Amino acid sequence: MNQEIKKILKNSLITSLIVLVYGIVVRNPIVYFGMFVGCLISTFCFYMICQEAESAMKSGSPFKMTVTGYMKRYAIYGIYLGILVKFFGFPVFLGGAVGLLNIKFNIFLKVVSTQFEKIKKKLSSLK
């Protein structure tokens, strides 16, 4: 697995732990149940994507493998969000939806920090 992917997974787990600690401190089930579990599911599904990509490269039918993986991930998302709406209500559902954006947030931060470092390097070379 690529080092950047490992770093994204590590940062995602750290973000999940921060969300859990924050949820426990404020004693809010929206945060510690909805967002934390959403963060974990997001991290797990990103790991599934990485594993499927590696095995699709070695497989004879990568299209079928990736489509079924895609459907599995969205079924996991749908079941999780459906359970939240049905049993815990709309606010916890929104917290879970925000938690599912954990990987996307960490990838965004990685891209922004990389761009910031490039700009900083260009500015320092101008001096």
From Swiss-Prot:
GO cellular component: plasma membrane; proton-transporting ATP synthase complex
InterPro entries, alphabetized: ATP_synth_I (IPR005598)
Pfam families noted in UniProt: ATP-synt_I
Record keywords, A-Z: Cell membrane, CF(0), Hydrogen ion transport, Ion transport, Membrane, Sodium, Sodium transport, Transmembrane, Transmembrane helix, Transport
Membrane spanning stretches: 5-25, 30-50, 81-101
Example GO BP: sodium ion transport
Membrane topology: Multi-pass membrane protein
Domain of life: Bacteria
Family: Belongs to the bacterial AtpI family.
General remark: The ATPase of P.modestum is of special interest because it uses sodium ions instead of protons as the physiological coupling ion.
Protein name: ATP synthase protein I, sodium ion specific
Species of origin: Propionigenium modestum
